[in-house]
């Protein structure tokens, strides 16, 4: 067997879990939770009292961090574990916008990241396109969770006038 037959494609997460368990009773407003297999930010938590047949239960209302859709998880026993997504936010300098809607971003180590599309949020999309057209130095914040990535914010770091 030659070496070519044993080439493995390296993945950035190296098999790391996309979520971690957290007891439902400890998840608070503005924390994160997985509801219906989607990473969400918790906007409301209510807890019912312990009944004669069991546990206190938690009710979560949360917003999907990528689609902004409202999701609810109804009455999870507070002692049970819920999945919580690993959420990361990374800043990249915007280098280019392609005609097919992909952005070219400069990473910290000097490489380019070219696999991300422009955001679907209209106001953010307009700010990015207008700022880029004006030749401003723009830095975009990319939120990543559960294998998805999306541009979520924009900063002008002092432009070429």
Curated annotation (Swiss-Prot):
Disulfide bonds: none annotated. The modification Hypusine is found at residue 52. It comes from the Eukaryota. Lys-52 undergoes hypusination, a unique post-translational modification that consists in the addition of a butylamino group from spermidine to lysine side chain, leading to the formation of the unusual amino acid hypusine. eIF-5As are the only known proteins to undergo this modification, which is essential for their function. Pfam families: eIF-5a, IF5A-like_N. SUPFAM superfamilies: Nucleic acid-binding proteins, Translation proteins SH3-like domain. Gene3D superfamilies: 2.30.30.30, Nucleic acid-binding proteins. Keywords: Hypusine, Initiation factor, Protein biosynthesis. The keyword Protein biosynthesis applies. GO terms for biological process: positive regulation of translational elongation; positive regulation of translational termination. InterPro entries: IF5A-like (IPR001884), IF5A-like_N (IPR048670), NA-bd_OB-fold (IPR012340), Rib_uL2_dom2 (IPR014722), Trans_elong_IF5A_hypusine_site (IPR019769), Transl_elong_IF5A_C (IPR020189), Translation_prot_SH3-like_sf (IPR008991). One of its GO terms (molecular function) is ribosome binding. Residues 1-21 are annotated as: Disordered. Translation factor that promotes translation elongation and termination, particularly upon ribosome stalling at specific amino acid sequence contexts. Binds between the exit (E) and peptidyl (P) site of the ribosome and promotes rescue of stalled ribosome: specifically required for efficient translation of polyproline-containing peptides as well as other motifs that stall the ribosome. Acts as a ribosome quality control (RQC) cofactor by joining the RQC complex to facilitate peptidyl transfer during CAT tailing step. Belongs to the eIF-5A family. This is Eukaryotic translation initiation factor 5A-1. It comes from Medicago sativa.
């Amino acid at each position: 067997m030659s070496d070519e037959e044993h080439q493995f494609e390296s993945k950035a997460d190296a098999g790391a879990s996309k979520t971690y368990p957290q007891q439902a009773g400890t998840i608070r407003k503005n924390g994160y939770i997985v509801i219906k297999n989607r990473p969400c930010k918790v906007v409301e938590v209510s807890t019912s009292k312990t009944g004669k047949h069991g546990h206190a239960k938690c009710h979560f209302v949360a917003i999907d961090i990528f689609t902004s859709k409202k999701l609810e998880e109804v009455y999870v026993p507070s002692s049970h574990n819920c999945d919580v997504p690993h959420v990361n936010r990374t800043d990249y300098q915007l280098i280019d916008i392609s005609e097919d809607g992909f952005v070219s971003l400069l990473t910290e180590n000097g490489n380019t990241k070219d696999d991300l599309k422009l955001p679907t949020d209209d106001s953010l999309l307009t700010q990015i396109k207008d700022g880029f057209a004006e030749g401003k130095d723009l830095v975009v914040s990319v939120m990543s969770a559960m294998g998805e990535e999306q541009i979520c914010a924009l900063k002008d770091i002092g432009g070429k006038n």
